[in-house]
């Protein structure tokens, strides 16, 4: 059982993530969550003021993980094109390893929840797009991609690709692996 401060909070977030991994994609209710944890709903509200706060905790985990990995990629990889490929691959792999989080990233789990949650996901996707744009700009100066190509449009296309693969994965009940065709598709998307 969770004894230390913060341990119960983490247990609640992990349980929400596990519930989101169910292929049927049922709505998460505090009653169902409390039952799964063998707690009262009141006990849940001692740790989180609202269900929206629980989703904010999951989004915070996603942001910390994704941007931590992006920072590592951009620091270690000197090629702009390799940065771009590694970031897209990481985003697809993150979904593959964190199925429940994929439903948060696609907004599927946020339907009928506080709209600020979807805004936060949108802001995260905008930050990812800006990072891809920087990597593509670097690739253009390094002669790895066409220097006259519109890097903003290219970065947007890559984000659309990633979110589309996330959607396919979530909507298929997690059977369509987001990385399944990535090697062939990366050659098309990155002009390799």
Regions found by a protein language model. Give the residues of each.
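Basic, helix-initiating cap at the start of DNA-binding domains
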Residues: 1-36, 53, 65
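Short hydrophobic/aromatic patch on the recognition helix
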Residues: 38-48
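Hydrophobic/aromatic residues within well-ordered alpha-helical segments
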Residues: 8, 51, 58, 62-66, ...
């Amino acid at each position: 059982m969770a004894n230390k401060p913060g341990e119960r909070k983490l247990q609640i977030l992990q349980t929400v993530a596990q519930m989101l991994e169910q292929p049927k994609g049922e709505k998460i209710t505090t009653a169902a969550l409390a039952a799964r944890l063998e707690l009262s709903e009141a006990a849940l509200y001692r740790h989180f003021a609202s269900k929206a706060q629980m989703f904010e905790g999951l989004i915070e985990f996603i942001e910390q993980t994704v941007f931590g990995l992006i920072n590592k990629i951009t620091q270690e990889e000197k090629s702009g094109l390799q940065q771009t490929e590694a970031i897209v691959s990481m985003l697809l792999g993150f979904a593959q390893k964190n199925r429940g989080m994929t439903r948060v990233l696609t907004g599927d789990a946020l339907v009928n929840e506080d709209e600020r949650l979807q805004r936060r996901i949108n802001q995260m996707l905008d930050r990812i797009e800006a990072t891809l744009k920087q990597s593509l700009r670097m690739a253009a100066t390094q002669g790895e991609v066409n220097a006259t190509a519109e890097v903003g449009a290219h970065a947007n296309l890559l984000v659309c690709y990633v979110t589309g693969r996330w959607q396919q994965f979530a909507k298929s009940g997690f059977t369509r692996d987001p990385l399944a065709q990535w090697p062939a598709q990366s050659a098309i998307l990155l002009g390799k």
